[in-house]
UniProtKB/Swiss-Prot annotation:
It comes from Staphylococcus aureus. The lineage of its organism: Bacteria, Bacillati, Bacillota, Bacilli, Bacillales. It catalyses: 2 5-aminolevulinate = porphobilinogen + 2 H2O + H(+). InterPro entries: ALAD (IPR001731), ALAD_AS (IPR030656), Aldolase_TIM (IPR013785). CDD domains: ALAD_PBGS. Zn(2+) binds at C118, C120, C128. This is Delta-aminolevulinic acid dehydratase.
Length: 323
């Protein structure tokens, strides 16, 4: 009987390493940090074990730890002292993220700062834009100028990449126009253009204090049941000038990561979101899984699906890679 002997290429660890198709590197990782304006706070987020809200005055130690591990890309999320109905704190000169960015750039010039460009952390209603008084929904076109102001303010503070996440129609085009007019034509846009209205975001909203005070975000984030819609969003953002595309969430949407990869030649970013991280942590803390092996399998699955970069809360990946 003749048959194929596939096991020949699995015969030893060295052989398996040699023929491995996908690899996870420290250079692939973008690490989120939650920054609060209050002093002397380092508070573990209950629903995100191992992740902390950190004060501006304590930020340097967190940045040093991440940098020493080999992380070279950071994404800041702000928890401001005060909020209003239009998210003013997102774009003021001394906003919490602007201050954090200046601290990071002063410490490490080669640390890439990816700026999450949204309003939800700064609005008193928790939505991602200006609320229309009549429809009680986010007003798409009135929100766009505020996003542009936020992006420019973030770049002025030292951000290297703008990552708009509020899923307004036309947000890439308007931000690109605004950056170019301000002379920042070399700043790339990493669009959250394929972002689903997912239940996996829950722990993040605890961490960033950004849960909507009414309703939900289903009128601007995508339906988890839809696949072709992701390609329409991708096509629009590419036309508008995005340089990289985020798929969020990642693990339950690996088919979408592959679709996006197959339909574009720009880098694809998988966001390993808070709920995915927390489920893994909970299972590991109960002794049900081997955390290191499961995390690395998750990472390589995202790379295999087509992700060029991964946004992850798990900085321990760097330690795993060192081992």
């Amino acid at each position: 009987m003749k048959f194929d002997r596939h096991r020949r290429l699995r015969s030893s660890a060295t052989m398996r390493d040699m023929v491995r198709e996908n690899h996870v590197r420290k250079e692939d990782l973008i690490y989120p940090i939650f920054v609060v304006e209050k002093d002397d706070v380092k508070k573990e987020i209950k629903s995100l074990p191992g992740v902390y809200q950190i004060s501006l005055n304590l930020l340097e130690s967190e940045l040093k730890e991440a940098y020493d591990l080999g992380i070279r890309a950071i994404m800041f999320f702000g928890v401001p002292n005060s909020k209003d109905d239009i998210g003013t704190g997102a774009y003021i000169h001394d906003g919490v993220i602007q201050q954090a960015t200046r601290i990071a750039k002063k410490m490490y010039d080669d640390l890439l700062i990816v700026a999450d460009t949204c309003l939800c952390e700064y609005t008193d209603h928790g939505h991602c834009g200006v609320i229309d008084d009549h429809t009680h929904d986010v007003d798409n076109d009135k929100s766009l100028p505020l996003l542009v102001k936020t992006a420019i303010s973030q770049v002025e503070a030292g951000a290297d990449i703008i990552a708009p996440s509020n899923m307004m129609d036309g947000f890439v085009a308007e931000i690109r126009r605004g950056l170019d007019e301000a002379g920042y034509y070399n700043i790339p846009i990493m669009s959250y253009g394929v972002k689903y209205a997912s239940s996996f975001f829950g722990p993040f909203r605890d961490a960033a204090d950004s849960a909507p005070s009414f309703g939900d975000r289903k009128t601007y984030q995508m339906d988890p049941a839809n696949r072709l819609e992701a390609l329409r969003e991708l096509e629009s953002d590419l036309k508008e000038g995005c340089d990289m595309m985020i798929v969020k969430p990642a693990l339950s949407y690996l088919d979408i990561v592959r679709d996006v990869k197959n339909h574009t030649n720009v880098p694809v970013v998988a966001y390993n979101v808070s709920g995915e991280y927390s489920m893994t942590k909970a299972a590991a803390q109960n002794g049900w899984i081997d955390e290191e092996r499961v995390v690395m399998e998750q990472m390589v699955s995202m790379k295999r699906a087509g992700a060029d970069m991964i946004i992850t809360y798990c900085k321990d990946i760097c330690r795993y890679l060192d081992n």
